[in-house]
């Protein structure tokens, strides 16, 4: 959520009881700078201190019980500075022995006939509880927290502040702030939502699980509604300035180019080309996402579009996330276009006189198509008349980077490409009203990759399988999650150790190493050797995840595969299976969690990237699917795009109705409109 000005406070943080200069420093580390921030600093979870019936309590379970003290507490000391306090409670006519280790100070706080609440582990056989916390009723004189805290909020904190302190300070702030409603009475009544006052007070100090659910539902809807208001308003602004030059491409020339391709387009590719061409002919700027599974042929579709721009007298640009991918795209496009187009490559490695000449040719129109990394968005990169901007693996760039590239031309058409199929849930959130073309069909002759799962102890067997492929003249990838060994992850294989091991097995000259710490020149040299079949086995981190294309590679081993998400595993797997030869992917993993086992099982069951993306989103959540910063998604405090998908659709419909009807711009919504405009509209989530 944004910095809040719909919550007004009569004082600053320093004026709150218990907050001094040192506490301010700690709060600032938690991104709490104002009383408003404090009020919106929501708990990460809740401790359930609800008192239960002992007759229903399971043995060795954590329980909360309430009873009357009927023996005075006794403390016994043992060892060095260790103690054991024993006291007996009567709990609904059941005599319970309570034991507290290393809390001797409780002896002065617990009195005969006093009613107390104890939280701890229950031993049904011995009828005793090993307590870790004790609460006193609200009428008592003790300083500990009250027993009426059934659902206790737990906050993310840092050294220098305690849970009780932040709870007390939030309670104090809530008593004094003025909270303006973010939703209209009409919306709240329509969807049976609570007031923001009730919602915030309940999220911080819930009186019941039912209240907490109602508060969570209201706040989640509010977050989604404000986000969708921003998206709908931005869409309105973009469409109002979306005038574009109609690209009058040479249809006969384009058809001739397609006929000269060394392969036949799939029906899905043809459909995508037609959809894009219709956009190019339209008087408004194209804003389209081209998504396709790994190896589905998105680059060819992009190439046809670039060629069409050339026939109409316009330049095109393609921005990709890595230098390796940029070089590979440039190489493949040069081969496709031949002498018909002047293709240039601009990355961070292009410097000095070479860069100067390239920029001059770009500005005078000599270059038809520019391929590059984020170097394309630098201020001195000036196009002559760019008509199409393509961003490959667009979620790896921030919102601002994509916008800067788009602004290289006054009326530029925009095409986003991704080999990570976007789940529908994220598509409507991140991409709003963007048109989507999908390529779900693989080129003719491609065989599905056979994926198997092996445990670590089966490594030698997998090695024999890989050796068998190498003897056929094929090549192989071996993927590891780490570059170097880690003391925190001792059981995880690292790429350097595995590289050295495979060198001993196959010979030094046959094995190459690729990872993110190598320089661009070193990476290029290794990839060139692998592409030219000067090395048989490439040991790598996930730096090869996207776009690398070596058709002769037919075997992939992914070590410690359970440390990757489904989408990453699928992208890695897509480096093989790029020819008419049968390819194999072996996942080596001994997962210790149910989630890890589930991921391995799913990978062996399907090669459909669209299905995998949905499953990955369900398992990991939207924040981890792309990474919040890369995706353009805000970091919602309560809302969850998977669990609250239906709510997201409702919020989107309501926001769209308000914006499109113009009602949002009337006086009734002045307060909310100013809030969205000042806090959200021009805010980037990069």
Curated annotation (Swiss-Prot):
Provide the top EC class.
Answer: isomerase
Ranges where the record places region Wedge domain: 50-149
Q: Which Pfam families match?
A: DEAD, Helicase_C, RecG_dom3_C, RecG_wedge
One GO term of the biological process aspect: DNA repair
Q: What does this protein do?
A: Plays a critical role in recombination and DNA repair. Helps process Holliday junction intermediates to mature products by catalyzing branch migration. Has replication fork regression activity, unwinds stalled or blocked replication forks to make a HJ that can be resolved. Has a DNA unwinding activity characteristic of a DNA helicase with 3'-5' polarity.
How are the domains described in the entry? The wedge domain within the N-terminus inserts into the replication fork junction, where the lagging and leading strand split.
What is the name listed in the Swiss-Prot or TrEMBL entry for this protein? ATP-dependent DNA helicase RecG
Q: What gene does this protein come from? A: recG
């Amino acid at each position: 959520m944004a910095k809040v000005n719909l919550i007004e406070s009569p004082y600053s943080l320093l004026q709150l009881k218990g907050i001094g200069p040192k506490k301010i420093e700690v709060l600032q580390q938690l991104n709490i700078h104002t009383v408003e921030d404090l009020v919106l600093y929501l708990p990460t979870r809740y401790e359930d201190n609800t008192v239960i019936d002992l007759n229903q309590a399971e043995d060795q379970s954590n329980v909360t019980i309430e009873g009357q003290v009927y023996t005075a507490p006794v403390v016994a000391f043992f060892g060095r500075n260790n103690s054991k306090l024993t006291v007996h409670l009567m709990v609904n006519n059941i005599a319970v022995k309570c034991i507290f280790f290393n809390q001797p100070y409780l002896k002065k706080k617990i009195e005969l006939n006093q009613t107390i609440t104890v939280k701890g582990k229950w031993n049904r056989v011995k009828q005793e509880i090993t307590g870790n916390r004790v609460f006193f009723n609200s009428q008592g004189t003790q300083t500990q927290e009250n027993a009426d805290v059934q659902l206790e909020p737990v906050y993310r904190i840092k050294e220098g502040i305690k849970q009780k302190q932040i709870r007390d300070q939030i309670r104090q702030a809530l008593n004094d702030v003025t909270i303006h409603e973010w939703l209209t009475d009409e919306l709240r009544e329509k969807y049976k939502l609570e007031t923001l006052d009730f919602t915030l007070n309940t999220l911080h100090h819930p009186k019941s699980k039912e209240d907490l659910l109602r508060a969570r539902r209201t706040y989640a809807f509010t977050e989604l509604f404000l986000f969708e208001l921003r998206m709908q308003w931005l869409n309105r602004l973009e469409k109002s300035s979306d005038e574009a030059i109609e690209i009058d491409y040479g249809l006969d020339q384009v058809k001739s180019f397609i006929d000269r391709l060394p392969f036949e387009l799939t029906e899905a590719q043809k459909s995508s080309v037609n959809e894009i061409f219709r956009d190019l002919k339209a008087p408004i700027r194209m804003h389209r996402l081209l998504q396709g599974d790994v190896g589905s042929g998105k680059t060819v579709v992009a190439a046809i579009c670039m060629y069409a721009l050339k026939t109409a007298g316009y330049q095109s640009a393609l921005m990709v996330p890595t230098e390796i991918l940029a070089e590979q795209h440039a190489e493949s496009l040069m081969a496709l276009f031949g002498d018909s187009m002047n293709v240039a490559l601009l990355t961070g490695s292009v410097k000095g006189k070479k860069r100067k000449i390239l920029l001059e040719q770009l500005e005078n129109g000599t270059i038809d198509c520019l391929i590059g990394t984020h170097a394309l968005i630098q201020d001195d990169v000036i196009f002559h008349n760019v008509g199409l901007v393509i961003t490959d693996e667009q979620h790896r760039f921030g919102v601002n980077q994509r916008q800067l590239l788009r602004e290289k031309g006054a009326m530029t058409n925009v095409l986003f490409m991704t080999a990570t199929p976007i789940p529908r849930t994220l598509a409507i959130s991140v991409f709003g009203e963007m048109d989507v073309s999908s390529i779900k069909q693989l080129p003719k002759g491609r065989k599905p990759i056979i994926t198997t799962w092996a445990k670590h102890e089966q490594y030698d067997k997998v090695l024999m399988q890989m050796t068998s492929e190498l003897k056929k003249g094929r090549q192989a990838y071996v993927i590891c999650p780490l570059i170097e060994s880690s003391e925190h992850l001792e059981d995880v294989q690292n790429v350097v150790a595995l590289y050295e091991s495979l060198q001993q097995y196959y010979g030094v000259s046959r094995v190459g190493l690729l990872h993110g710490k190598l320089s661009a020149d070193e990476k290029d040299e290794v990839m060139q050797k692998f592409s030219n079949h000067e090395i048989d086995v490439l040991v790598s981190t996930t730096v090869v995840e996207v776009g690398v294309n070596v058709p002769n590679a037919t075997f992939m081993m992914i070590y410690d595969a359970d440390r990757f998400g489904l989408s990453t595993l699928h992208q890695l797997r897509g480096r093989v299976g790029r020819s008419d030869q049968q390819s194999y992917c072996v996942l080596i993993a001994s997962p210790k969690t149910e989630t890890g086992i589930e991921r391995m099982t799913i990978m062996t069951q399907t090669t459909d990237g669209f299905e995998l993306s949905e499953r990955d989103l369900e398992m990991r959540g939207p924040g981890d699917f792309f990474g919040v910063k890369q995706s353009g998604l805000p970091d919602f405090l309560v809302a969850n795009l998977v669990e609250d998908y239906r709510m997201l659709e409702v919020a989107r419909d309501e926001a769209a109705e308000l914006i499109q009807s113009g009602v949002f711009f009337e006086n009734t919504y002045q307060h909310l409109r100013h809030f969205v405009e000042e806090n959200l509209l021009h805010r980037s989530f990069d």
